[in-house]
Amino acid sequence: MGFVYIVMTGYYKNVHKRKQNQVDDGPEAKRVKSSAKVIDYSNPFAVSNMLEALDSGKFGSVSKELEEIADMRMDLVKRSIWLYPSLAYTVFEAEKTMDNQQVVEGVINLDDDDDDDTDVEKKALCVVPSSSEIVLLDSDDEDNERQRPMYQFQSTLVQHQKNQGDVTPLIPQCSFEEVDLGRGKEMPSAIKAIVEGQTSRGKVLPIENGVVNEKGVYVGVEEDDSDNESEAADEDLGNIWNEMALSIECSKDVARETSHKEKADVVEDCEHSFILKDDMGYVCRVCGVIEKSILEIIDVQFTKAKRNTRTYASETRTKRFGESDNELKFSEEGLMIGGLAAHPTHAAEMKPHQIEGFQFLCSNLVADDPGGCIMAHAPGSGKTFMIISFMQSFLAKYPQAKPLVVLPKGILPTWKKEFVRWQVEDIPLLDFYSAKAENRAQQLSILKQWMEKKSILFLGYQQFSTIVCDDTTDSLSCQEILLKVPSILILDEGHTPRNEDTNLLQSLAQVQTPRKVVLSGTLYQNHVKEVFNILNLVRPKFLKLDTSKSAVKRILAYTPCDVRGRLTGSNSDMASMFNETVEHTLQKSEDFTVKIKVIQDLREMTKKVLHYYKGDFLDELPGLADFTVVLNLSPKQLNEVKKLRREKRKFKVSAVGSAIYLHPKLKVFSDKSDDVSDTTMDEMVEKLDLNEGVKAKFFLNLINLCDSAGEKLLVFSQYLIPLKFLERLAALAKGWKLGKEVFVLTGNTSSEQREWSMETFNSSPDAKIFFGSIKACGEGISLVGASRILILDVPLNPSVTRQAIGRAFRPGQKKMVHAYRLIAGSSPEEEDHNTCFKKEVISKMWFEWNEYCGYQNFEVETIDVDEAGDTFLESPALREDIRVLYKR
């Protein structure tokens, strides 16, 4: 016996053809003919008759899917009663009659328990005869007699076959097709009341403002003999997509020609949600309306200047060099008002923090009152890519702009490589190094090229400071260009000019453009005043601005006057008093409530100028175990430490101590120049007792473990003598050679050798150790081939160590990273470590503290070596001299 599933297919709009093509010559052939299988809703008794037909069928056991259909039926009944209240008596009388009906023969009972017969009857599903029945909901518009019905109930017949007395249901093979028919027609109120809220497998069909979006889902059973129908359906679907493409093109023309007044009169039937698609532009994800074509986006932002447009250089020929008319020209062209957007190619690659950073740059640099800002994003977070994207958008919209990028000389190749990777148009990148412009005349020639065409100029910090501070006549022209022409100044590693007493900070402050951007992965270095020196660079007299005055007064009020007097003295100015007060409160105050108030005020006064990103993307990496390993010194080392404490010069203590803590024999080299020959070092290494130097012994045990585990090691130090010593120790102990297993990077390494060493170390399976001067391996260095890091000494600036660890713990790292900060116990180095940690606390509290941290004091965690979770520390040889182990 056949069963028929009654499913409401949506707003069916003539997509599937009928099984039999009935073609008549007369006009009446196109009208829907009434039959026993058609229910005409223009008949007032149609609903009543349909419900009676539904309720008079046979009943079967209810599965989960059939329950849904039964629920759909009940929903239709309720809405029909709401539309025709007179049906209520008929329906409820039918329900009473259903309780007294007996189960018809031939119905499969899927429930084994006789006790559940009552439930089965309650969940009975209406079954209509085995022939397919179609219900057409006709329009109430009687004038349009030839209009086909918009809504259709189509039944699906599922055959059951008997095999050896058992009844086995044949599982229907259903196909699902989604047809978007665009905007629907206005519905008569009666039909709208019936259809509104109907469900297709529990999903409500949307009706907005009385207009039906004719977007339906056809659910049917594929028939073996329906090849012709499938081909016809495919042809119809193809026509639909063609019609949609035509509609989109038509909508573009209408959008351009419609006036603003006419647009205001149009009643929107869609709450648009626009998204950016690379091939179309800003498109509504709901209805497909294009707000802005991709061609318009590119034309506005990335068109080249017209030939009849004067260049920046030609316009200044009639004026004295350096006049401020350059800024006036920007204002006339709308630079202060016009918005800026990232190129679609860049936007598709941006992460959320980069998108937020791009918008932050626009709010400061492209505004009515432009000013500088600080982008303090974590190392490896993509600051370079973000600012490259901004500069290309900036230049595309304002081709006359002159960007100047000042950065450490060593990372210039990295910047150029990134520019080539992300360029959307060919913008010349100029610098003095590649052009070998060594004298002022050659440098002036490069600067004139930069002025005359759309390009970007790169200079090193030292080079910029030297030119600006040069008093010779040859430098005057170069100085005038560098100080007056730049329209935007980018400072990578922007914490470099943090000392107010240096020529570098003073020379950068003389650049006249208000658009200055500082990029830094470690903004806080040593002291609070250094951060405010950088703030004063991008926003002159920052503490005296109206946005800062109230916060400054509140912060000063938190500290008693006698404490402020002891900190700064009676003759100190307000800025010095403020900086010392903040540093003392965050570092030494025992009242955590006061610390929180200071943090909140600091963030309030800098929120529009400073954009901070901690680096949550690092959580996606395999992980970081940052250990501080305090070692017990050998007797000979302790004797040398006693002598070292008599030294009053702090730098001397640090330099000599770094050698002694590694091995006492290195003391003889600490006073000499860094140029120690391999032969001299080899002779000393062959004679020494390794047990006398705990750090040297730790290093040798560590490289043995790394070699066995197939992991690569990074070794960082502030000084070259320790690096040279360990390089020769590894060569003699393991037979490793420089350039194959061992690589070295210092401040004297050329750019070409620098790039080659990084690429070879990361890619070569033979590479074992990379020795690096910790200051030379700053931003722009990626050494993700290594998974173990050894820090030999304690830089007084804690951010230097953080950057060194960031060389390996950054995007691209595939392994868990373990860092070991070696500390000589009972020595001045242990005291330096405590001082550095207090500086770290200030940075963490200022930028990273939140209400979820509670009243924690940011102390490092002391852990047992056995519970460190590091297999290397389980080695007896490696853990032999460990006195205490900390973990950040």
UniProtKB/Swiss-Prot annotation:
Residues 701-866 form the Helicase C-terminal domain. ATP binds at residues 377-384. Residues 364-541 form the Helicase ATP-binding domain. Changing residue 810 to Q: In drd1-5; defective in RNA-directed non-CpG DNA methylation. Keywords: ATP-binding, DNA-binding, Helicase, Hydrolase, Nucleotide-binding, Nucleus, Plant defense, RNA-mediated gene silencing. A motif (Nuclear localization signal 2) lies at residues 305-312. InterPro entries: CLSY/DRD1, Helicase_ATP-bd, Helicase_C-like, P-loop_NTPase, SNF2-like_sf, SNF2/RAD54-like_C, SNF2_N. A motif (DEAH box) lies at residues 492-495. It is found in: Nucleus. One of its GO terms (biological process) is positive regulation of chromatin binding. It comes from the Eukaryota. The keyword Nucleotide-binding applies. One of its GO terms (molecular function) is hydrolase activity. Belongs to the helicase family. This is Protein CHROMATIN REMODELING 35. It comes from Arabidopsis thaliana. The gene is DRD1.
